[in-house]
């Protein structure tokens, strides 16, 4: 493209949903002829997509804005922290514009005002799958915005609004475009994947000569037709989650669920405004494992929530022992500006919160290590993410990018594996987080057209 094209620097912070917002803005910028540059110095203007979920994210976002202001001086701010424009303008009154999450039009208007486009969108084309910030072989697929829940520790609804589902045919067409562009793994994200379509009354829409409901199970059935890995994130533990487990058992959907349980004490869950039937949760986890023995269940928890007693923390540790989850993330509770949990009595001292967090993670590390050790001697289908010298770094079907473990393929160089390759790996060793093994030689031309037809041993 011409050197005269206006140049935009872009900083993307926050969760995968925010990453999708960034990708949509970047796609529109490229469609309109803007060059995306990797440095502040080379940019005519900088867009910062912020996060504002917890205090540390607010600090990171403000720091990023400040860095861009100091290095460039022309900065447009968007994203979740943009819902608090007074906080941004108090710190940096010279920012050009501030807008909230998924407000793509406002971002583009601000860019146009600061840097008019010099491009005819009918001449230069952008790939129909858009601009991606992830590696080419995987992509996040956002199916909705907002959330109807009012968890006491969370301010997402005040930032992103109530649930607004995308029509199922629109989502499936986007997934098709991504697969045409080389994506081999789709990561379904939202604030509440289980609630998908409830706001649209599960309306039916046509795709590929068939009618699909705007509902989680129907969406999964459609995605399974694309022949790539499909992974579900941010699933709320509703009973109808049971309906998608057979798709996992049949190899049509990755046997993986990311479900944030948050705690195991009924009283704490009630204070969090989360479902509190812990016995039913345990029964459901065991039922999923019976229906699909290969299933991986990942979850997140909050330790040290206001009022959490020693006994309630011990109940949380007992839950880990009983549930035998594969992957777990945990956070020590920290107040979030605007969250109703801030007003709860009996805050847990910071030192005690950190002590409990360490004990919690140590207990789960033992469980995860044992579950990974049990995979030694098995063959796992893996997707290569990175080549480091002679070792290929990959992920198994049990591992989402960034948050889960890795599979280190020792003979990756010998077999000339490439990023994006799907390969069967014999597992020879493990630790608390990762697996190690050797790829089995295969003729790429002989691989089945549907990646999900390969089953783990």
From Swiss-Prot:
It is an enzyme of class 2 (transferase). It is found in: Cytoplasm. Residues 133-370 form the Radical SAM core domain. The keyword Metal-binding applies. Residues 6-116 form the MTTase N-terminal domain. One of its GO terms (molecular function) is protein methylthiotransferase activity. Residues 373-441 form the TRAM domain. Its cofactor is [4Fe-4S] cluster. It catalyses: L-aspartate(89)-[ribosomal protein uS12]-hydrogen + (sulfur carrier)-SH + AH2 + 2 S-adenosyl-L-methionine = 3-methylsulfanyl-L-aspartate(89)-[ribosomal protein uS12]-hydrogen + (sulfur carrier)-H + 5'-deoxyadenosine + L-methionine + A + S-adenosyl-L-homocysteine + 2 H(+). Keywords: 4Fe-4S, Cytoplasm, Iron, Iron-sulfur, Metal-binding, S-adenosyl-L-methionine, Transferase. [4Fe-4S] cluster 1 binds at residues 15, 51, 80. It comes from the Bacteria. GO terms for biological process: tRNA modification. Belongs to the methylthiotransferase family. RimO subfamily. This is Ribosomal protein uS12 methylthiotransferase RimO. It comes from Xanthomonas campestris pv. campestris (strain B100). The gene is rimO.
């Amino acid at each position: 493209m011409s050197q005269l094209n206006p140049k935009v620097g872009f900083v993307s912070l926050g969760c995968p949903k925010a990453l999708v917002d960034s990708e949509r803005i970047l796609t529109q910028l490229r469609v309109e002829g803007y060059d995306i540059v990797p440095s502040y110095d080379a940019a005519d203007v900088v867009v910062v997509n912020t996060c504002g979920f917890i205090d540390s994210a607010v600090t990171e976002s403000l720091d990023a804005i400040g860095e861009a202001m100091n290095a460039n001086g022309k900065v447009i701010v968007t994203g979740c922290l943009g819902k608090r424009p007074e906080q941004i303008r108090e710190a940096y009154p010279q920012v050009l514009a501030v807008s909230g999450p998924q407000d793509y039009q406002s971002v583009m208007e601000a860019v146009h005002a600061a840097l008019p486009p010099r491009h005819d969108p009918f001449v230069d084309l952008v790939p129909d799958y858009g601009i991606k910030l992830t590696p080419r072989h995987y992509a996040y697929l956002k199916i909705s915005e907002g959330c109807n829940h009012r968890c006491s520790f969370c301010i997402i609804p005040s930032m992103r609004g109530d649930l607004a589902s995308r029509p199922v045919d629109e989502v499936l067409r986007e997934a098709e475009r991504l697969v045409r562009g080389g994506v081999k793994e789709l990561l379904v994200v939202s604030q509440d994947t289980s609630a998908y379509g409830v706001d649209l009354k599960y309306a039916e829409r046509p795709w590929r000569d068939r009618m699909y409901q705007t509902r989680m199970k129907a969406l999964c059935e459609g995605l399974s037709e694309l022949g790539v890995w499909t992974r579900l994130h941010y699933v709320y533990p509703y009973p109808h989650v049971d309906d998608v487990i057979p798709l996992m058992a049949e190899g049509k959907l990755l046997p993986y669920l990311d479900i944030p349980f948050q705690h195991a004490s009924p009283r704490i869950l009630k204070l969090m405004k989360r479902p509190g039937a812990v016995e039913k949760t345990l029964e459901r986890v065991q039922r999923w494992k019976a229906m699909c023995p290969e299933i991986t269940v990942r979850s997140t928890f909050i330790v040290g929530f206001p009022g959490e007693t020693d006994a309630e923390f011990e109940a949380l540790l007992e839950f880990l022992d009983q549930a035998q989850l594969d992957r777990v993330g945990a956070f020590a509770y920290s107040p979030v500006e605007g969250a109703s949990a801030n007003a709860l009595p009996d805050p847990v001292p910071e030192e005690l919160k950190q002590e409990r967090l360490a004990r919690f993670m140590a207990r789960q590390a033992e469980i995860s290590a044992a579950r990974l050790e049990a995979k030694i001697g098995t063959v796992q289908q893996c997707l290569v993410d990175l080549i480091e010298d002679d070792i290929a770094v990959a992920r198994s079907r049990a591992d989402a990018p960034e948050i889960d473990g890795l599979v280190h393929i020792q003979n990756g160089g010998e077999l000339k594996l490439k990023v994006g390759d799907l390969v069967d790996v014999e597992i020879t060793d493990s630790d608390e987080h990762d697996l190690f093994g050797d790829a089995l030689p295969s003729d790429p031309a002989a691989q089945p057209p549907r990646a999900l037809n390969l089953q783990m041993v």
